[in-house]
Amino acid sequence: MKNLWNIFKKGLIAENPIFVLALSLCPALATTSTAVNGFTMGICVLFVITCNNTVVSIIKNVVNPKVRVPVYITCIATIVTVVELVMQAYAPLLYKQLGIYLALVVVFAIILARAETFASKNPVVPSFFDGLGMGCGFTLALTIIGMIRELFGSGAIFGVNVFGASYNPALIMILPPGGFILIGYLVAIVKVYNQHMEKIKMQKLEKANGGEA
């Protein structure tokens, strides 16, 4: 159980798809002008990557390695199609706001990368938790980016006005340049945090080794 928790939590910060692995930055930039859009896209990717990891792990021994990538993409496309149909039926407004980027989930680097590097080499349960962790990390990153951009770009969070009518919004925050700048700062913050945690881990390890000596 502890091993599964470690697999899950690495996707949150230590190997966050956006802030550490720097995968799927284009949709991260395009769909995070508001917190709702970022969160919704994150949930969609969470569902797709978790389901795809599970399916790939199940079929890994019966798929010819020479055609594995087309098979993985077909699996992803099938799951994404289901997500699109559900959103068209129950959340048409969000579906329109996400636009073509929802369909492009099929070729998101993070989904194919986890299928290739983890799910195709590990059992079903660890693959499920890997997809769940990476999906949660992706959702967390997109939601944080969306909240900050919406807060400073329109003075609201999840559509709720925070600063009042007198606030003069920084429109650059809801434009691509502002998104790039923000992502850069967040990547730097996460990098410093990970380095700090690694340093603490090494210090504990040195103390433990010293104690044994």
UniProtKB/Swiss-Prot annotation:
Keyword tags: Cell membrane, Electron transport, Membrane, NAD, Translocase, Transmembrane, Transmembrane helix, Transport
Pfam families: Rnf-Nqr
Enzyme nomenclature, EC number: 7.1.1.-
Residue ranges crossing the lipid bilayer per the database entry: 11-31, 39-59, 69-89, 93-113, 128-148, 170-190
InterPro entries xrefs: NqrDE/RnfAE, RnfE
The keyword Membrane is assigned to this record: yes
Example of a GO biological process term: electron transport chain
Membrane topology reported for the UniProt record: Multi-pass membrane protein
Cellular localisation: Cell membrane
GO cellular component: plasma membrane
Secretion signal span: none
Functional description taken from the UniProt entry: Part of a membrane-bound complex that couples electron transfer with translocation of ions across the membrane. Couples electron transfer from reduced ferredoxin to NAD(+) with translocation of H(+) out of the cell. Essential for energy conservation during autotrophic growth. Contributes to ATP synthesis during heterotrophic growth.
HAMAP family: RsxE_RnfE
Protein family according to the UniProt entry: Belongs to the NqrDE/RnfAE family.
Subunit structure: The complex is composed of six subunits: RnfA, RnfB, RnfC, RnfD, RnfE and RnfG.
Protein name: Proton-translocating ferredoxin:NAD(+) oxidoreductase complex subunit E
Gene it is expressed from: rnfE
